[in-house]
Every structure is written in structure tokens, then in C-alpha cells.
């Protein structure tokens, strides 16, 4: 498919490709695009790094495109420490989950907003959980957070398990990995003041993402474990 010229983009990942070129994965409103960047060791190559808002002209109709023009479209988002690791985590999620050339403008907008919030030092966990949930929902993998798989409203004192690609199922026998109704209802309202809601949201998103990641671990998660 042909793509509009001069569209906004962010670099998700870049690696050397043949002599003096790079193979770059971009996030654009038109989806994830892969393109060859010529003269990657020149000025263009200095721009082809994560978290820099770009305007890129893509050429070619095949799945592997060429970068015709690339310019800065704003100030690079500067992050360090766990905020930087979080940005790398978002990039890896998008590379792994977002189909090539499948337009998701809402994902692009939320990604840009999340980078800005990370750079401003906002609390990491709520930002990451929100991004994970919105990404799943936009890709069609979302599920109701205030009702079970039978359409019944969640009970505050109920216990639930996630049936991936179906939703939340109420259970009446204790077992590992369950979620409290109060925690789930807090998640649905993004009310992180409820005790246990954030840690439960992390467990829930990991379960929801796992099936779509194909059993391969995310490399960026290991960064958070290093001293």
C-alpha cells in the first residue's frame, strides 16, 4: 500500500543494514512501518533514534519501504533511569504486537502523550498500565473491566480469573492468580488509590499480554531487574 508523504513518526528500533544503511521500524498514525534509511551514518542517522518526534516521507509500495526524507518535528523526549526503560518497554511492545501497516492513529497519539508524561516524571506504573490496556483494546484484544463474561456486573467482594480473549470469569474456589472485584472495579475507573489495585493491574496486563507475545519474554523487562 502507498502511504502519505511527510507523516509524523517515531523510531521504535534501528539496526545496521548493508553498507551505510539502517533498517528502521517506525511508529506512525498509519501503523508500524519498516523502511531502509540510506546514509545512516550521516545527519539522517543522527535523527533515527527513539523518542524523537519526526516527519518522514516514505517511498515504495511494498512492505519494506525507503525513507525519502526525514526531519525533526519537535524536541526529543529526554528520559533517564526507569523512565527510559519504560520508553524502551513501550517500543518493544509495539514492535511485538502492532501488525505492519495496520493504521492505529489512537495508539500513535497515546504513545506520544505517554512519552511526554514519562519525561515529566509522572508515576510510571499508572502510565504503563494505561498504555498496555489501551493498546490491547485498540488492537481488538480488550475485555470488559466492570462486568464478567456473562454480562453480570462485577461484585466488589467477588473473585475473578481472566479467560484470555473472553473476559473475566467469577470463581468461588480459591486458586492462584485470582483478582478481587474491588481491585478490578478500581482499574476500570483508573482509581489507583484503592489498595492493591496497581499491583493487580500489573498481573492482569501480564496475563492479557502473554498470549499475544507468543511465549517469548520481553527483553526490556529485564532492565527493571538489573541493579
Curated annotation (Swiss-Prot):
Presence of the UniProt keyword DNA repair in the record: yes
Domain of life the protein comes from: Bacteria
Keyword Metal-binding: no
A Gene Ontology BP annotation from the UniProt entry: double-strand break repair
Covalent S-S links between cysteines: none
GO cellular component, one term: bacterial nucleoid
Keywords: DNA damage, DNA recombination, DNA repair
Family: Belongs to the RecO family.
Entries under PANTHER family matching the protein: DNA REPAIR PROTEIN RECO (PTHR33991:SF1)
Function: Involved in DNA repair and RecF pathway recombination.
Protein name per its UniProtKB record: DNA repair protein RecO
Organism of provenance: Pseudomonas syringae pv. syringae (strain B728a)
Lineage: Bacteria, Pseudomonadati, Pseudomonadota, Gammaproteobacteria, Pseudomonadales
Encoding gene per record: recO
Amino acid at each position: 500500500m502507498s502511504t502519505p508523504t511527510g507523516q509524523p513518526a517515531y523510531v521504535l528500533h534501528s539496526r545496521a543494514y548493508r553498507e551505510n544503511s539502517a533498517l528502521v521500524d517506525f511508529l506512525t498514525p498509519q501503523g508500524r512501518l519498516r523502511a531502509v534509511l540510506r546514509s545512516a551514518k550521516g545527519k539522517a542517522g543522527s535523527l533515527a533514534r527513539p523518542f524523537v518526534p519526526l516527519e518522514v516521507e516514505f517511498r515504495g509500495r511494498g512492505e519494506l519501504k525507503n525513507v525519502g526524507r526525514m526531519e525533526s518535528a519537535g524536541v526529543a523526549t529526554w528520559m533517564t533511569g526507569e523512565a527510559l526503560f519504560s520508553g524502551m518497554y513501550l517500543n518493544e511492545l509495539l514492535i511485538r504486537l502492532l501488525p505492519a501497516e495496520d493504521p492505529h492513529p489512537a495508539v500513535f497519539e497515546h504513545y506520544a502523550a505517554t512519552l511526554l508524561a514519562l519525561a515529566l516524571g509522572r508515576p510510571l506504573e499508572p502510565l504503563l498500565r494505561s498504555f498496555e490496556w489501551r493498546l490491547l483494546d485498540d488492537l481488538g484484544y480488550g475485555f470488559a473491566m466492570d462486568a464478567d463474561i456473562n454480562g453480570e456486573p462485577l461484585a466488589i467482594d467477588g473473585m475473578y480469573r481472566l479467560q484470555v480473549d473472553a473476559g473475566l470469569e467469577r470463581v468461588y474456589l480459591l486458586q492462584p492468580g485470582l483478582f478481587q472485584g474491588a481491585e478490578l472495579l478500581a482499574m476500570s475507573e483508573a482509581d489507583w488509590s484503592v489498595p492493591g489495585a496497581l499491583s493487580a493491574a500489573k498481573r492482569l496486563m501480564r496475563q492479557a499480554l502473554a498470549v499475544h507475545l507468543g511465549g517469548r519474554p520481553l527483553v526490556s523487562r529485564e532492565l527493571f531487574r538489573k541493579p
